């Protein structure tokens, strides 16, 4: 997602301290920690862990916002609560042990100040959470955006420790003012205290969508370095998120039917065909590469128009093993067992992490 030019801020910022907007982050800083209001008993897993990644579009469901060629900037509290209830129902239905979320709002004007991390903890069987901001400003005086606080979160049945936000590089092609208020991409790493497992980590990220300056590829490289370091240290990890990249052997790379004509350029992945090759070659993917090559459609996890799923942007990887055949994109009743297209522009992706191999 890309913000419109915030030229309205130029005279404002020239006459005051720009730090008043608080948009920046340290290279590494502690995550914000959460706990459900009422904890649910979490037994030790026996054979597998259910792992899910899900971009929830900040509880926006199928409201058409300005970057989608719509007119909306903010939601009412009623809209947010209805949409969050739908998302919570999906999470309860899939019943993950570890849930990696992207585009989660906490105390943001656009989502009526609903803390969506706390909402999902309090309305599912997940107990603990860690949050890392990717878009933060106390106030954006443009188009009614107001306070912005959105990011990535990892929720789990068991405690999360050593949770940290690791900053990713920003787009260098943007004008300085846009870059100041634009998303600050990050990795959220957290150790999950799964009973019977030592040194088990969750790595969650949401990578750059629109860049022509190599930023996305650089971010993927940093993610690879993070995973390589954990692997070299003997740790076990599950990694996932919205990578905003297509796998090799994608039949379509641009000119998707669900794109709109507006302020924002459509998604084109031409020239990026090899961006995820190292992840697929070095680690186990919940989406087998050969199955995707044979038939792309069952693995599509994004729908821009709310009518059909058109491409694959969301992934799960591990340096251990997934249960064979357990990876699935929950598109609808026939493909994944539950209708999801009405609640977000992304579908949840799940897989079963094989405990016996890891242990």
What are these regions (language model features)?
Residues 17-39, 213-214, 225-238, 245-359:
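Metal-dependent phosphoester-hydrolase catalytic domains
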Residues 41-51, 148-162, 176, 181-205, ...:
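Beta-strand-turn-beta hairpins that frame and shape the catalytic cleft
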Residues 56-59, 104-108, 134-138, 160-161, ...:
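Solvent-exposed loop/turn segments at secondary-structure junctions
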Residues 17-149, 357-359:
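N-terminal, active-site-proximal structural segment of metallo-dependent hydrolase catalytic domains
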Residues 1-8:
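Sec-dependent signal peptide recognition
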Residues 71-76, 104-106, 170-179, 205-214:
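Surface-exposed cleft-lining segments at the edges of enzyme active sites
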Residues 13-15:
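C-terminal motif of bacterial Sec signal peptides marking the signal peptidase cleavage site
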Residues 49-56, 86-113, 155, 190, ...:
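Active-site beta-strand/loop signature of hydrolases that rely on acidic residues for catalysis
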């Amino acid at each position: 997602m890309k913000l419109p030019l915030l030229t309205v801020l130029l005279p404002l910022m020239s006459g005051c301290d720009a730090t008043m907007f608080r948009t920046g982050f340290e290279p590494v800083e502690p995550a914000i920690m959460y706990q459900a209001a009422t904890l649910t008993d979490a037994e030790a897993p026996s054979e597998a862990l259910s792992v899910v990644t899900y971009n929830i579009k900040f509880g926006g469901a199928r409201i058409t916002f300005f970057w989608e060629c719509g007119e909306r900037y903010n939601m009412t509290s009623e809209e947010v609560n209805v949409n969050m209830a739908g998302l919570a129902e999906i999470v309860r239905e899939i019943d993950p042990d570890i849930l990696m979320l992207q585009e989660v709002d906490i105390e943001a004007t656009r989502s009526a100040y609903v803390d969506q991390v706390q909402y999902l903890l309090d309305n599912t069987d997940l107990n603990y959470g860690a949050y890392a901001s990717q878009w933060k400003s106390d106030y954006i005086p443009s188009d009614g955006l107001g306070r912005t606080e959105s990011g990535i979160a990892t929720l789990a049945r068991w405690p999360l420790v050593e949770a940290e936000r690791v900053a990713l590089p920003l787009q260098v092609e943007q004008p300085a003012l846009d870059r100041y208020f634009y998303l600050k991409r990050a990795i959220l790493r957290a150790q999950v205290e799964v009973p019977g497992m030592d040194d088990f980590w969750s790595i969650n990220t949401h990578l750059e969508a629109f860049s022509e300056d190599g930023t996305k590829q650089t971010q993927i490289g940093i993610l690879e370095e993070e995973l390589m370091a954990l692997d070299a240290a003997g740790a076990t990890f599950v990694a996932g998120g919205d990578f905003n990249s297509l796998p090799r052997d994608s039949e379509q790379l641009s000119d998707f039917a669900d794109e709109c004509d507006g302020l924002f350029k459509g998604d084109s992945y031409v020239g990026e065909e090899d961006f995820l090759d190292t992840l697929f070659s070095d680690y186990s993917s919940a989406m087998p590469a050969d199955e995707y090559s044979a038939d792309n459609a069952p693995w599509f996890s994004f729908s821009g128009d709310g009518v059909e799923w058109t491409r694959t942007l969301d992934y799960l990887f591990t340096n251990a093993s997934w249960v064979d055949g357990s990876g699935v994109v929950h598109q609808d009743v026939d493909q994944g067992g539950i209708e999801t297209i009405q609640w977000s522009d992304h579908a949840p992706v799940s897989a079963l992490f094989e405990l016996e191999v890891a242990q």
